[in-house]
Amino acid sequence: MSPLACRQCGATDGPFTRDGLCENCEDGHPGWVDGLSADDYHADHTTISSSGLRALLPPGCPAQFKHDRDNPQAPKREFDLGHAVHTEVLGEGPEVDVLPFDSYVTKAAKEARDEARYMGVVPLLRHEWEQVQAMADAVRKHPVAGPLFAPGSGIAERSIYWTDPTTRVRCRIRPDWLKPAGEGRLIVVDLKTARAVDPNALQRAVYEHGYHAQAAFYLEGSKALGLHGDQEPAFIFVFQSKTPPYLVHLVELDFPALTLGAARNERALRIYADCERTGNWPGFNDRITYLPLPPYAEKRDQEEYL
């Protein structure tokens, strides 16, 4: 995208603010950008993302969120596989560099890995690349996921911006895949790799990682831009196991889960708006916390020792 373009909606006719926004985006108008790099998307401190909102709530807190936002961490190897699968399935994502090594034991392998990181690409060992190919193939062969991700049938990695009407906080999302499903309905798709994809494991993962809040936020953003046509949009998680045979499990959350997710987002937006307004980003508690044992531990010890 041209440097003389709004970094949110891509408009080139200006004028632009000091933050690189056009007048429409500065005034809170919704918009989207196709082709925005992931680095540019995540570097935006004028908007809040779903992961940012989740980080503001327990077990996180505003102080930790602000520190992490202002001090981005280096890429972690445990995310490399997922990033590479995204690129293979979606046709969009970080570039992958397949290194001619079986491990990172040798100095040459470590230097090649570090060089790839420096160049902003994802380094993979040969066997990791073979795994990525097998995982992508399993997605393509799935009777529902395969057609869902059919090349040319959707939009990958669109960056979407809007303003929350209650708090006036500027929000952003970046759906993995936007898929028109006929008769004007939109399907918002998120592809995730996981250790296990059985229903019990996915229930725990959704709650522990706040995926119900993510789904609600992405649906809200899609509707704010009117991308959903004349029907309510759907949000589908495509979970894939990282172990053979790389099972694929598609999940749509029920109404109570989405309602609770939206409620979490509303509270996090209020917290964020207050922190931005006051400049105060609190931790957990500035006073002494009176801390009991977890209920399960107290019950177990009472039965054992009292």
Regions found by a protein language model. Name each.
Residues 6-9, 22:
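Short cysteine-rich clusters marking metal-coordination/redox-active sites
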Residues 70-74, 117-124, 199-210, 254-256:
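Short histidine-centered catalytic/ligand-binding loop motif
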